[in-house]
Amino acid sequence: MKKNLCIAFFLIFLNGLNAQPPNGCEQKITSKILIVGDSWGQFMFLYKGYKEALRQYGFADITELGGATTIIGAQTGTWTRGLGKKNLRAQLLMHPEIEDVVLMLGGNDFVWDYDYGDPIEVLDNSIARTNLGMDTVVNIIREIRPDVRIILPSYDYPNFIDPLIDLPLNPYFDSWESFGFPNPYEANTSMQYIEAKREAWSLTHPNIIFVQNLGLMQYHFGQKDSLPDTSPLGYFYPRLPPYAPKTVPFPFGNQMYPTPQKAMGLLGFDAYHLGPAGFQVFAANHIKKVLLDKLRGYPTETILSDSLNDGWVNSVGEFGTGEIKIGKDRMLKEHKGILSFSTKNIPDDAIITGISIFITRKKIEGNNPLKSVFPNNAKIDIMNGPINGLLPEAEDFSVRMDMEDVGCFVGQANRNNYSTRIDLQSDAFSFLNKTGITQFRISYNSTIQNTASLVKYYNGGAIDEEPLAAHMDIHYELPQQEKVKQAPNNENCAVFPLPAKNEINLRTTKEIEKVSITDVLGRQLSFYGLETENKKIDLGNFSKGLMVLRIYYKDGTIEEKKIIKS
């Protein structure tokens, strides 16, 4: 009862936290993600975890749905009968724009069947029963929308230690007590067993993608303080030292530690659920591993900007390379950013169908210029070739470009490491230099008067596990005889198993000359020479997640396949 009252009060507070919709050229927001689930799904939706993570990656015009399809305490049966089933069907029918369904569901079906002291294997029958319910949920979704992908994220570890060990009045204390006061190692190894069962179930369904999140919060947040050593009940827990972010392995983390309290909900007093920051990290993990490639439209080519030639120029004739500076500094000098891309490898006969540029905020001086009348105050100009020379020069500030004001800016980049996406209009495509360098100039006409509003962005040399580097996605088609074939059921090549663990097999009806594997940003990971019809490719050295396999046939055709390493 304590727990339900606490959650109910908190949800009333959360319902008032609705951010203003982001602006875009058409100020149009599309709901491409549907969350179906229990309390994890409901908190994810109420905290707008996906919405905020999508802003982080430059997709402020995309958001999630879930108000009618997430309920605290929900089980699989909630969505397979009665009002829950009706709501699920209605959302799928009313929103044809949905492309991915996230199932944050299943835990409530079996977790309460566990009695302290029993081996974890006693849950096998309950998990099997839960999987039958999950089968029914999937069938309901497939009946209406057979085309959508279904994402099954794991949960992450609980934290009974920090919020409960000194506060027996916590609404989750009864749950901890009913499980026999398990320490983090006991709770975490049980979670690993359960999630392995859930992952195995996901592999029995086509087009379901399991995303492992165990240990994610440990990896991202670290443990700031050492853990307590005793509880009021005399329960002993060894004091463990703090650790810095990104120093434990991911996935799975350190089994001796709980999820850090900083990631937990209810201001750190929740033992099970994440808070706003935690759910944003949770959503960002799914976006990077599963959604980002689709949101970017599977670009034909991705080019990092040339960090040596990237830079800035300002209104008093100063200029420099390195950071990309845009806006007004503290002396009210206006800065314009210069981006340089080597586009010489784009085929001469390529028919360009789309170009998007992503720039990521590194830091800010003063106010955010994009918060005023964005996007009307943001402008990008294009030059076929260098503006003057390859490096920024004073004249670059005012020189006439080949075409000006050619892009739609999406995303205000209201935090460091947030990206703004710039979609170029089709009139600008003809100015892409297919034999050399294409340069861009970006400026902000901030309405913030007499104060600094300077944004500094990463250039193309920023290397990190996050996509921080300035880059350009190019979509193009080739004449029919060279056109890349992307039909998912193309009979020329079969790739199996998918998802894959350590290797994939290729079986083709045509002779292969070579294959390449790229990551979701289009960066080449490896090249292989292949000459026979049946081949194996070792994925052991690649990180888990989505990759693109490109197959080059000896007849000159090319085929692409999306592959997932789990």
What are the residue ranges of the model-derived segments?
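Extended extracellular/luminal ectodomain segments enriched in beta-structured repeat modules
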Residues: E334-H335, I346-S356
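Flexible, small-residue-rich N-terminal segments that precede or flank a structured functional core
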Residues: G297-K344, N445-Q449, N459-E477
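C-terminal outer-membrane/trafficking sorting elements
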Residues: P488-F496, A500-S566
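Alpha-helical cap/lid subdomain in secreted, periplasmic
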Residues: K85-G265, F269
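Sec-dependent N-terminal signal peptides
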Residues: N4-F13
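A short beta-strand element within beta-rich, extracytoplasmic domains
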Residues: F341, I351-I364, M472
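Conserved SGNH/GDSL esterase-like catalytic core that processes O-acyl groups on lipids
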Residues: T30-V36, W40-A128
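Beta-strand-rich interaction/scaffold domains
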Residues: I364-I437
